[in-house]
Amino acid sequence: MPTAAPRWILHVDLDQFLASVELLRHPELAGLPVIVGGNGDPTEPRKVVTCASYEARAYGVRAGMPLRTAARRCPEATFLPSNPAAYNAASEEVVALLRDLGYPVEVWGWDEAYLAVAPGTPDDPIEVAEEIRKVILSQTGLSCSIGISDNKQRAKIATGLAKPAGIYQLTDANWMAIMGDRTVEALWGVGPKTTKRLAKLGINTVYQLAHTDSGLLMSTFGPRTALWLLLAKGGGDTEVSAQAWVPRSRSHAVTFPRDLTCRSEMESAVTELAQRTLNEVVASSRTVTRVAVTVRTATFYTRTKIRKLQAPSTDPDVITAAARHVLDLFELDRPVRLLGVRLELA
């Protein structure tokens, strides 16, 4: 059940998580540039960096970068394949440790979670954060950074200021002093495109956005304005739910070594992706309600289309046929670089 508005919210973010898990498995690589992604082969086409150690980041390597580009920037790096099972096990261990502390914990992924310190408790948030860092490091060998505030969005921003391996607290008292001169892109949910549109209005900083007339923003951007103004002024979501996170969908995608031009190859790939994804759904005792297919062409044009099933199902014939039907909704008149299947769940 959701808690009452907490006195403090702590955002716990594991540092360079995937790389850190790999370093625990390969201690001989400590202090060296490590890059995780694909099958660990930097010559493999169309595979990207999933995570880079801080030593690799010093060379400009970033998540999402093609492995080949990463290899050029940091030729001495060690490349390792992704190991989701190991990351999932490490994440579950950390979450269990957080819950053992007795606070509500809301998990947001492998490497991050929110923890609420409720009103009326004498616990000092800095001391709680220090205890969290100590427990996680001693029990798992993983380092984390922790942001502290009175809402989720501000706590997450504080975590970015705490990295790596630190603690940072943002409050009403220091919000504008710390954030006022930063670009609006520093706010959660404000991306590069929005930043450019705001710049055309002469709005470049968090301070300027916080003091912009709401009518001007509403006429330009619509209803999302209220959220931006809330974030710019340091506001945000104060609810931390201790309910277990339940996935709403399962998905798989594949980037092909060469672009596909043959429709039968595309159909085979979509069928295999649908079956693989369905196997995971069945293993988790869920049922499928909608089937989505994503197509990315050689020009990186990306579209997703979706179909609702007549009734929830886990029948392989129904699911794979639905995936092929959705694929048929695309013209497929250009070479295809990537295909993905997402199954939405009841």
Curated annotation (Swiss-Prot):
Q: List the keywords (alphabetical).
A: Cytoplasm, DNA damage, DNA repair, DNA replication, DNA-binding, DNA-directed DNA polymerase, Magnesium, Metal-binding, Mutator protein, Nucleotidyltransferase, Transferase
The record lists the catalysed reaction(s) as: DNA(n) + a 2'-deoxyribonucleoside 5'-triphosphate = DNA(n+1) + diphosphate
Biological process (GO) annotations? DNA-templated DNA replication; error-prone translesion synthesis; SOS response
Q: Show the GO MF annotations.
A: damaged DNA binding; DNA-directed DNA polymerase activity; magnesium ion binding
KW Transferase (keyword) present: yes
Protein's UniProt keywords contain Aminoacyl-tRNA synthetase: no
Location(s) in or outside the cell: Cytoplasm
Stated EC number for the protein is 2.7.7.7
Q: Which cofactor does it need?
A: Mg(2+)
Where's the UmuC domain? 9-191
Residues at which Mg(2+) binds: 13, 111
One term under GO cellular component: plasma membrane
Matches recorded under Pfam families: IMS, IMS_C
Which residues are the active-site ones?
112
What is the UniProt remark on how the cofactor binds and its stoichiometry? Answer: Binds 2 magnesium ions per subunit.
Signal sequence residues: none
EC primary class = transferase
Q: Which residues carry the site feature described as Substrate discrimination?
A: 18
Q: How does it assemble?
A: Monomer.
Q: What does this protein do?
A: Poorly processive, error-prone DNA polymerase involved in untargeted mutagenesis. Copies undamaged DNA at stalled replication forks, which arise in vivo from mismatched or misaligned primer ends. These misaligned primers can be extended by PolIV. Exhibits no 3'-5' exonuclease (proofreading) activity. May be involved in translesional synthesis, in conjunction with the beta clamp from PolIII.
Q: Which family is this protein grouped under?
A: Belongs to the DNA polymerase type-Y family.
Protein name per the record: DNA polymerase IV 2
Q: What is the source species? A: Mycobacterium tuberculosis (strain ATCC 25618 / H37Rv)
Upper taxonomic lineage: Bacteria, Bacillati, Actinomycetota, Actinomycetes, Mycobacteriales
Give the gene that encodes this protein.
dinB2
